Amino acid sequence: MARLDSRVTVRLARAEDEAGLAHLDAVAWTPASGFPSVMARANDPFFTFFTDDSPPEAHLVAEVDGRMAGYIRLRPVTSLPESAHVLGIAGLAVAPGDRRRGVASALLAAAEQQARARGARKLSLRVFGTNATAARLYERLGFGVEGILRDEFCIGGRYVDDVLMAKHLA
């Protein structure tokens, strides 16, 4: 079980966090947890972490002793009003040196709190079938598997399942 670090604080992202979040994004992902094609964007001189679909206010930042340790991106799963009650976690990253210290748990708890405050009834996410560590964390925090898209991605010549998980909030 992860050791919870009482020094972890979570706050809303600010525009000035962009460079730090881009760096964190570049060092946090591996082919087992993220898409190599997306990871390659860190080398693009025109890459911006924040976009129209993912502005600063869509992100929560975890800090340990005032240093950026992780982030979570929370946004609607679609633009349709019929799914306005569902928010999705569209990215969760923790710096390698800050793993297993409660950073991801703190981010997920803060995202759940924010989702509830925004009136969401369901919080969903997707995780690679190869990322057993993340899947166990999500299950421990009350997320359940809602579907599996078999062989959805081909990463490094290997087919990987896309696992849809969700937590019902109401």
Task: Cite the ranges covered by each PLM segment.
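Acetyl-CoA-dependent GNAT
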Residues: R3-V8, L12-E18, H23-G97, L108-A110, ...
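Short hydrophobic/aromatic beta-strand or adjacent loop that forms the aromatic wall/cage
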Residues: E57, V160-L164
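Flexible nucleotide-binding loop
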Residues: R101
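Short glycine/proline-centered loop/turn elements that form peptide/ligand docking sites
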Residues: A104, L108, T130-A134, D151-G156
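Conserved GNAT acetyl-CoA-binding A-motif
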Residues: A115-R126
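Conserved catalytic-core motifs of GNAT/GCN5-like acyltransferases
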Residues: S124-V127, E139, G144-V160
